[in-house]
Amino acid sequence: DKNQNTIDTNKYSSTILEESADAGQSYVDETLFLGDSNTARMYRIFNYCSYDNAIGSVGMSGKSLATYACVQFQGYSGYKTMPEAVALMQPRRVILTFGTNDLSSSYSASSFASDYANGIKAVQDAYPSVDIIVNAIPPLGQQHSNQNLTQTQVDEYNKALVQMCQDNGWKFLNSAEVLKDSSTGYAKSGYVLSSDGIHLTCLLYTSDAADE
């Protein structure tokens, strides 16, 4: 049932970010985007962001957020974790998009949310004044290359994420609902690559930029 794990927007009205008018380039400039390959694609391919305000690590999972050293800074030796990077870059807010690489039939939504929360708390500990916004895991295409991934589990994880945000006083960006085709419950046509049904396309980033 594609509606089985629909998020109750009334229950989480104080947690889910409401749609708002374009906040302008200054909002983007004050924001640090953290995430997996979909975030990496934002600046490596589509120029939606720059290396100054986005850190994306291909294949990275939410559960490794606190510990995985993947960021290099000029003047510093070795690699830094994302929490360490936040402390160095000092953004006004971070928008985190993880979860696609955590999906597994042996990894429950509650375990995922708990592990991910530990990573987000590490970000807060590293730079306490930062505002936390957790982005939903994007939907899959109806045809996708990894048959171990299911849209049902994506929905379960997102439902756990909004509860995690409410429990911790963080904001939740329910972008998945905008990207979904309401008739199928999967990603709208053209919003994920036809080659794998997982990675977001340029069309989506262009639409996002127009809608912000």
Regions found by a protein language model. Name each.
Residues 1-28:
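N-terminal, intrinsically disordered, polar/charged segments of Gram-positive cell-envelope systems
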Residues 21-114:
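Conserved SGNH/GDSL esterase-like catalytic core that processes O-acyl groups on lipids
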Residues 31-33, 93-97, 131-136, 171-174:
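Structural recognition of the beta-strand scaffold that forms the well-ordered cores
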Residues 37-41, 100-104, 138-142, 177-181, ...:
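Solvent-exposed loop/turn segments at secondary-structure junctions
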Residues 100-101, 124-155:
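Active-site segments of SGNH/GDSL-like serine hydrolases
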Residues 101-110, 146-151, 193-200:
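Second-shell loop/turn segments in exported
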Residues 140-175, 198:
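Substrate-gating cap/lid alpha-helix
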Residues 205-212:
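Conserved small/polar residues in nucleotide/adenosyl-binding loops
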